[in-house]
UniProtKB/Swiss-Prot annotation:
It comes from Salmonella typhi. InterPro entries: DTB_synth_BioD, P-loop_NTPase. It holds the Pfam family AAA_26. Coiled coil: none annotated. Its cofactor is Mg(2+). One of its GO terms (cellular component) is cytosol. The gene is bioD2. It comes from the Bacteria. One of its GO terms (biological process) is biotin biosynthetic process. It is an enzyme of class 6 (ligase). This is ATP-dependent dethiobiotin synthetase BioD 2. SUPFAM superfamilies: P-loop containing nucleoside triphosphate hydrolases. Keywords: ATP-binding, Biotin biosynthesis, Cytoplasm, Ligase, Magnesium, Metal-binding, Nucleotide-binding. It catalyses: (7R,8S)-7,8-diammoniononanoate + CO2 + ATP = (4R,5S)-dethiobiotin + ADP + phosphate + 3 H(+).
Length: 231
């Protein structure tokens, strides 16, 4: 059984967190135990409990087990620390150990990335290098907006060039007034080398909703049944 997935996006703010939430809810409703994982979270805020990130808290809220925050988000960077101008090392061993620990506890771990596929960490390395090291299959979130076809095709190409399988993509309607939505979905369906596994409509406060019904796990049926897939 394929245990781990990496969620990337065509850009920042395209809906990786709500899609991660939807996938976790869909897997959970199918009787699987799940956990969300946000290895590196930028823009975190200081709280009485320590640094906290709103996206990581969403993932924590839909995980099957009651897990400490640090198990979901081992590296939480403040707004200041999130700038690439703020140089600091990233402990990739910590990220790998955290992922391995979660993988031992649940059936599936949904790993949410930071920004897009080539978004840089504070050490000026893209997180995708760690994803390649971990050999994680990739699901891509496409925020449906002007220019998204170009961004989606470039992201899919970059994932393939890195030797990882793109196992599916999800359309997230981030602009309810966008014309030609159906045409964009049709073009992406024809050009992307992976199946469309879900469409999320525009929903206010989507991160607080039940979203599992928008994910078609049947499109991942053969993928879920294997231990490892090749690009």
């Amino acid at each position: 059984m394929l245990k781990r997935f990496f969620i990337t996006g065509t850009d920042t703010s395209v809906g990786k967190t709500v899609v991660s939430r939807a996938l976790l809810q869909a897997l959970s409703s199918g009787g699987k135990s799940v956990a969300g994982y946000k290895p590196v979270a930028k823009g975190s805020k200081e709280t009485p409990e320590g640094m906290r990130n709103k996206d990581a808290l969403v993932l924590q809220s839909v995980s099957s087990l009651e897990l400490p925050y640090e198990a979901i988000n081992p590296i939480a960077l403040s707004e200041e620390e999130s700038s690439v101008a703020h140089s600091c090392p990233i402990n990739y061993t910590l990220l790998s150990n955290g992922l391995a620990s979660l993988s031992d506890k649940v059936d599936h771990v949904v790993v949410e990335g930071t920004g897009g596929w080539r978004s840089l960490m504070n050490d000026l390395r893209p997180l995708s290098e760690w994803v390649v090291q971990e050999q994680l299959p990739v699901l891509m979130v496409v925020g449906i907006q002007e220019g998204c076809i170009n961004h989606a095709l470039l992201t899919a190409q970059a994932v393939a060039n890195d030797g990882l399988p793109l196992i599916g993509w999800v359309a997230n309607r981030i602009n309810p007034g966008l014309a030609h939505y159906a045409e964009i979905i049709d073009v992406l369906g024809k050009k992307l080398p992976a199946p469309l596994i879900g469409e999320l409509p525009y929903l206010p406060r989507a991160e607080q909703r039940e979203l599992g019904q928008y994910i078609r796990l049947s499109m991942l049926g053969s993928v879920l049944a294997v231990d490892r897939i090749m690009a």
